[in-house]
Amino acid sequence: MAVAENAGVKVDSSGQNLDNNNTAASATETTKPPCPDDDQSPKSDSSTPLTIDSTPETDDRINETAQKVQTLNGFSGNGERDNNGEIKDLADAFSKLNPMAQEFVPPSLARSQSGVLRNGLGFTNNFAAPPKLADGNDHFPRRRRSFGQGKRRMNKRTSLAQKDDVIRRTVYVSDIDQQVTEENLAGVFINCGQVVDCRVCGDPNSVLRFAFIEFTNEEGARAALSMSGTVLGFYPLKVLPSKTAIAPVNPTFLPRSEDEREMCVRTVYCTNIDKRITQIDLKGFFEMLCGEVHRLRLGDYHHQTRIAFVEFAMAESAIAALHCSGIVLGALPIRVSPSKTPVRPHFPRAEFK
């Protein structure tokens, strides 16, 4: 009967024939040649997971193997990085460095290294800091410097443009007679345009003088060039385009009140004074030719020649002193012009004997 024939068959819960499977497995083992690498452990494929019975011996063996692997990889038994492994990694990294290579410094820090960076490190409050924090501020210092440089460049360009404009409005006048004052010279050029400033200067290598005249516009300066050859005093003037602007007078030296303006009328400015001339000599020279000297200020000895401010008691004496320009005092001809600044008594007035 079919029932009797199937009675000896073993069937598991999945309906597979275990006896047939065992028979097939044993037949395969007898026919398959032994592999030298085979450790006689059961093999598993992708469909059947490998299961190992957990025993105290297998657990100890697995832990021992894992510790050996971690030790070889540079980790200690508790999973932390081993010092020997770190030293080995550092030694390998340093062995790859070029000892002849130059230190790299970013361009943004090159200008700020002096006095701040030492041996590639910056120090803030006695602590080593990264180079970007060496100045104590990490808020984009490079961008801040670039803004400041741009502002300075803009201010410099603006000042240069303004200076060039002033130069184009200025003429240079030479061969000016010693008797010609700034008022006389400005009156000659008033027909060319409105005069902003007129500055007469002495030439130590000549008995003549030169001057700079600034106009309100370039048209006045161009018209002034046609005045070259005009006789003023005893000599014809030479007028050329100026290469420099008139230096402004320090406003702190200008008169601050009506009394100081009245003092300027009575004061003359003297240049090209012999260094051997003393204050007493200069005072006696002007009092003999012009009148009483109220106050006198003589410059220092640090230059080749000296300057002086002479304030007279009367305005008529100051006008007379202008005619003394060119007279030899000591070994040099003295230059006299109206003063734009008063003589302020910063210290007690010197006693003249």
Swiss-Prot record:
Residues 20-31 have a biased composition (Low complexity). Pfam families: PAM2 (PF07145), RRM_1 (PF00076). The keyword Zinc-finger does not apply. Its main location: nucleus. The keyword Nucleus applies. Expressed in cauline leaves, stems, rosette leaves, immature siliques and primary inflorescences. Residues 169-244, 266-341 form the RRM domain. Keywords: Nucleus, Repeat, RNA-binding. One of its GO terms (cellular component) is nucleus. A motif (PAM2-like) lies at residues 96-106. Contains a PAM2-like motif, which seems to be involved in the binding to the PABC/CTC domain of PAB proteins. This is Polyadenylate-binding protein-interacting protein 10. It comes from Arabidopsis thaliana. The lineage of its organism: Eukaryota, Viridiplantae, Streptophyta, Embryophyta, Tracheophyta.
